[in-house]
Amino acid sequence: MILKSQVEWALHCCAILAGLPEGRYLSTKALAELHGLPKEYLSKALQSLSQASLVDTTLGPSGGYRLARPSSEINFLDIVEAVEGKARSFTCTNIRDNNPCRPAGYCDSKPCAVARVMWEADEAWRNTLRRVRLSDLVGTLSEEVPAELWQSTFEWVLKRAG
């Protein structure tokens, strides 16, 4: 399964937005600059988050994005589905029906074994993403990123937050 690069961008941006003080916003420009991303493409990912009600937006000189609810109430699956959509990662086209050896009128009563395995794997993947909260990511990053870099990053962010 290959996810759009915007999924990675959205996850990282949400982790940064989780650190904003109440009532502050961060612009697309600042988020793009922080992550070295093209602003126009990042904007599309952020709009997807907004349409999914994961972030709030405001216009104007101090406008931008902030989380719409606490990071403990947003999971990875919420973010992935906001960018990628909610469709299953595997679509069965039932090619077994094309088998020339199949008797006329033969009908299978259950999905094929391939589809069942793929759907089970998809559900396991979604359950894993569902269990990981944005607040978990922030906690992991705060432990793994050197303290000086973590602090300087948020100082940089706060200077640009509206």
Which residues are covered by each model-predicted region?
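Beta-hairpin "wing" of winged helix-turn-helix
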Residues: S53-S62, R66-A68
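Key DNA-contact positions within bacterial/archaeal DNA-binding proteins
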Residues: E40
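Short alpha-helical segments that sit at the start of domains
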Residues: M1-C14
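A short alpha-helical element within helix-turn-helix/winged-helix DNA-binding domains
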Residues: K29-G36
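C-terminal regulatory/oligomerization modules of transcriptional regulators
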Residues: C92-G162
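Helix-turn-helix DNA-binding elements, focusing on the entry/boundary residues of the two helices
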Residues: T28, L46
